[in-house]
Each structure stands twice: as structure tokens, then as C-alpha cells.
A protein has these predicted regions:
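Long intrinsically disordered, low-complexity, acidic S/T/P-rich regions
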Residues: 1-4
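Divalent metal-dependent catalytic cores for phosphoryl transfer on phosphate-bearing substrates
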Residues: 6-18, 28-29, 47-162, 166-196, ...
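Short, conserved alpha-helical segments within structured domains
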Residues: 23, 44-49
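Short pre-active-site segment immediately N-terminal to the catalytic Zn-binding motif
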Residues: 32-46
Length: 250
């Protein structure tokens, strides 16, 4: 789960808690509306929108039955999750997406691998940047498994003339970069409350399969934000995300 930073910083005050699937739903809205005269639409559209929406669905079981962090008396924030469970969700998300379509599995697996490897060096919005020494072997085993998965899925996609183009490195990385943009843009809203969000930018947003650009976001007040260059098909694009306030358990 994602615990939004408390506006008043009070340890015992209610905190806004967002399921990973609710975060994914916001990512999916961005993906569905991505593309205009400047930005190429996702290709293959359905599969890319699906994996961006479902990229964290390895957390489904934990979303419905979360473990409590004894330090906060709330569900574990995603990065505070016990390491074995964190690694398990990094496998389960590609498992889920592979069942949707092999291409969904490939992009999801790239996302899992990238989270532990600086998002392939393509983003400064890095979340998993430190895993304790005692968990390195377990983490590396999971990551090696994802590389094996990617090789298997690329081979399967290449065997089908209808999907071989999708698996080309430039195309796969353009779609991976689109997932990173939608993910980090959603986290921009999920992690901090209205009134505390600051101007920032997102690097390596794909304009097409060969060209990337940095997209800046600036709060304008009244829950309104400007993006430059603007990447969506609706202007303005109206979105929302769900969550709930939880009081720390006694």
C-alpha cells in the first residue's frame, strides 16, 4: 500500500492510504489518454494500457489483507514491506500480467527488474535504491528469474508474426518508459497531499519509439496542474484516485 505523507505530520493523525491497485487505476487513466499530435499513442494500445493499469497487481492479496507495520500501526508502506513479501510481489505482478498477454508479462517484468536497477537509468524517480545485505541473494534470485522470463517471452513474441514488432528492443523500451512516466506521475499525486506538491519534471517520456522528452508539471492551485509539453488527448484531462483515511491502530 501507499501511505500519503500526512499534511500535518502528526504521528497519531489519520493517514490517507491507497491500495496498489488504486494507484494502478490512476496509472491506467494516464495511459488510456496518452497521445496527441506531439506524442504517439501506445502501441500495441490495448496491451500497453492493460499492463500499465495492472503493473502492481502482484499486490492484490496484500491489498485485501494487509500486514501492519508495528512502527506506524498502519499497513506497511510499500517500501517498508518486509523484503521477502516485496520480492514476492515483484514476481507476482509479471505472473498476473503474463496471463493477460505475453507482452503484458514482458513489460511488467521489465518494470520489476527496473525498480531494483535504477529504472534502467531512465528516471531519477527511484524508489527501491537500497536493499540490506542480508537480502541480496534473495533479491538477486528474483531478478535473475525475471531476466529468464523476459527471454522466454521475447522468444514467444518473436515466433508470432503479429507480435514480433512489439518485442523489438526500441518498441519495448518505449513502452517501458511510458509505464515509468505513468507510474511516477501517479505517485506524484499519491505520495503527497494537495497543497504540498511542488513543480518537478519527468525524464525520458517517449514522444515516439525513437524520441524522448522531459515533461514538467506545475501546480496552479485549486487541484489544477499544467504539464509541458502536454502529452494527453484531452485538455484538460480530469482524473481522480481513490483511497481512505485510516487511524493508526491502538
Amino acid at each position: 500500500m501507499i501511505l500519503q505523507s500526512a499534511a500535518d505530520g502528526g504521528k497519531d493523525s489519520p493517514q490517507f492510504v491507497i491500495k496498489q491497485t488504486e494507484h494502478g487505476a490512476l496509472c491506467g487513466k494516464f495511459a488510456k489518454h496518452f497521445g496527441n499530435e506531439k506524442f504517439e499513442q501506445p502501441f500495441p494500445r490495448d496491451e500497453v494500457v492493460d499492463v500499465i493499469r495492472c503493473h502492481d497487481n502482484g499486490w492484490l492479496a496484500d491489498d485485501e489483507n494487509p500486514s501492519l507495520d508495528p512502527d506506524t500501526r498502519l499497513p506497511y508502506n510499500v517500501l517498508a514491506t518486509p523484503r521477502s513479501k516485496l520480492f514476492a510481489t515483484s514476481r507476482k505482478s509479471p505472473d498476473y500480467n503474463e496471463k493477460l498477454h505475453p507482452y503484458c508479462g514482458l513489460i511488467s517484468s521489465m518494470h520489476s527488474w527496473g525498480l531494483y536497477n535504477g529504472r534502467y537509468g531512465l528516471s531519477d524517480k527511484i524508489l527501491v535504491d537500497f536493499i540490506e545485505d542480508e537480502f541480496q541473494d534473495e533479491m538477486n534470485g528474483m531478478l535473475e528469474g525475471e531476466l529468464v522470463r523476459q527471454g522466454k517471452l521475447i522468444s514467444a513474441l518473436n515466433e508470432n508474426p503479429d507480435t514480433a514488432e512489439w518485442a523489438e528492443k526500441a518498441r519495448a523500451f518505449a513502452n517501458y518508459k511510458l509505464l515509468q512516466f505513468c507510474d511516477t506521475l501517479a505517485l506524484y499525486f499519491n505520495l503527497t497531499p494537495e497543497g504540498t506538491r511542488e513543480e518537478t519534471s519527468f525524464a525520458n517520456v517517449p514522444m515516439d519509439v525513437n524520441m524522448d522528452v522531459s515533461v514538467s508539471i506545475k501546480p496552479l492551485g485549486d487541484s489544477t496542474y499544467s504539464l509541458n509539453p502536454y502529452p494527453f488527448d484531452d485538455d484538460p484531462l480530469k482524473v481522480f484516485f481513490e483511497g481512505r483515511y485510516l487511524q493508526p491502530f491502538a
